[in-house]
From Swiss-Prot:
Functional description taken from the UniProt entry: Involved in the aerobic and anaerobic degradation of long-chain fatty acids via beta-oxidation cycle. Catalyzes the formation of 3-oxoacyl-CoA from enoyl-CoA via L-3-hydroxyacyl-CoA. It can also use D-3-hydroxyacyl-CoA and cis-3-enoyl-CoA as substrate.
Active site (catalytic residues): H450
Organism: Yersinia pseudotuberculosis serotype IB (strain PB1/+)
Lineage of producing organism: Bacteria, Pseudomonadati, Pseudomonadota, Gammaproteobacteria, Enterobacterales
Encoding gene per record: fadB
GO-annotated molecular function: 3-hydroxybutyryl-CoA epimerase activity; delta(3)-delta(2)-enoyl-CoA isomerase activity; enoyl-CoA hydratase activity; long-chain-3-hydroxyacyl-CoA dehydrogenase activity; NAD+ binding
Name this polypeptide is given: Fatty acid oxidation complex subunit alpha
Amino acid sequence: MLYQSETLQLHWLENGIAELVFDAPGSVNKLDTKTVANLGEALNVLEKQSELKGLLLRSAKTALIVGADITEFLSLFNAPPEKLHQWLVFANTIFNRLEDLPVPTISAINGYALGGGCECILATDFRIASPEARIGLPETKLGIMPGFGGSVRLPRLLGADSALEIIATGKDVTANDALKIGLVDAVVDPEKLVGSALTMLKQAIDGKLDWQAARRPKLEPLKLNPTEAAMCFTIAKGRVMQVAGKHYPAPLTAVKTIEAAAKFGRTEALNLETNSFVPLAGSNEARALVGIFLNDQYVKAQAKKLSKGVAAPKLAAVLGAGIMGGGIAYQSALKSVPVIMKDINENSLDLGMNEAAKLLNKQLERGKVDGLKMASILATIRPTLDYAGIERAQVIVEAVVENPKVKAAVLAEVEALIGEDTVLASNTSTIPIDQLAKSLKRPENFCGMHFFNPVHQMPLVEIIRGAKTSDKTLAAVVAYATQMGKTPIVVNDCPGFFVNRVLFPYLAGFGMLVRDGGDFHQIDKVMEKQFGWPMGPAYLLDVVGIDTAHHAQAVMAAGFPERMNKDYRDAVDVMFDNQRFGQKNGQGFYRYTQDAKGKPRKENDEQVDKLLAEISQPLQEFSDEDIIARTMIPMINEVVRCLEEGIIASAAEGDMALVYGLGFPPFHGGVFRYLDTLGSANYVEMAQRYAHLGALYHVPAGLRAKAEHNESYYPVAAALLDVSTNQPA
């Protein structure tokens, strides 16, 4: 053994060939600060070996390196900029030393080589992969860019076009695609991977493969003539702005950095990469996007903990077909849980089956399933007009019309037909679970399971715990949601639960703004373009359905009269009274026609301004800041109340529910991350200016206390860098 640390080992293989094996504690290898330092120490040893002829780099695990340790990111980013800069120079010196070894080097890639793992293999002369390998640089998805030479080496290895696509999108590539673009030199069966890498290395040692020619382009300027460069980078910047937009600066920064570095060799190009990385790392967007990644891991770990030892059901049932029931049945069947889909109406069953078939056809068109697989999935959905066989289902999801009497009757009816251990769940969006539980003899077996529409696209499922819901019931439903490929978040019961409870104050803020003379077109534009919502409040209401929103608004007003009851007609009332229900009947705040693909196309409708004049002050222009404040303060206050009341268990779960359930702009990170970015004292001061608008604008006591004590919702990460050495502490 030449060198051994907690994360990697270096030893001789044969005839002057050394092997560097990544083998960290735990299930995967990460390129954390400790591993980077260990790599430097291993190279110290290797550089002294006069008999060294070649180096093979591989993993002892099922993946090479899954990336940097993202749990360290916020700490790294909190270091003073000059210290982060110095540490990146320190880390890059190590990768340069790996690249500059006076012998040929090869990486054997199994599983993932992502982020820092990809940058590590780029520093070797050759790369060979097994078929299941996936290689990529996902940094831009986290609000940063490659920092260990990825933006320098990848374009020089592949050419600018392919490299820009990988770096700007953050998508990884398969082994075969990597072979096509020149990212790897060969793809071999897993059992032959190390042997083939060794053979290739020996060929390089014997002069049959020119390893110096493989290395040289990575050290030199990018080979592009001025016309090619202008064309390539102009197109890339245009595409990035179209897809990422102004709220996500990392992809554009990466493209501009690669462009600026194109005319330089490795040293100057790496300096440019580091100079671009440091400001991105200190940005609010990076903190928010890294926070989302960490929160996602946290909520998935919570789900795993809750459902520990509980298997997903072998058979499920959905009561109520149609679009929603069909969507739930499709998702269940797609993820290998057969499902009974029961309805009282043959047409609804047809609609549900058609919805499932339509979604599977899309999968077929994309090559995700073949005809045989599609048929077998559809065969696991059993449409029925009666309850035959329902007693065999372990989890039954009621998804009938959003009416408490109808839901209660259906739940009581099915409970009489099933065993004492069968779990019942209601897919309701606003009706309190404890209210529905009153109709049941076994309320401990009952909870809420709130799916979001469209079911196949929306990652969140709210699991609602009633006062009598047992842990066993929660575990079964969480296990089912997880098996369905969803992110379940458990919330406590109240009207609207969490997501809808916090959505309606936002929509109420919109309604008050329109009442006071705000132009809904301007409001939508500001909330989309400036704040970053996927759609503004008027457009969202049209998509949700004005009738649905009108009903839910009444439920919320009854549940929280002190804040959500109103003594005036608002824009939703006007739309509802004029039977303008949104996309579902082609007219709401906007008019809808079908485009060539049959999708709704939004158009302005002059009639709407006339209708809204009944309930509005004369139109006036509000500032962007006013529009954002007047719509967002009610939502933010309600989100905070939900945490203070224990409706949600943590800031992390609240933020992920907002991002996954409502499309809250990821670059803000969720309400709690947004509050931490603004500063609680700054927020309270801002909200105070709007307090005259009513109870929705009154800041909860807990948030006021945080502001007084200058506290945040997320812990402030301590800097990880040892300032005396610029190395990991």
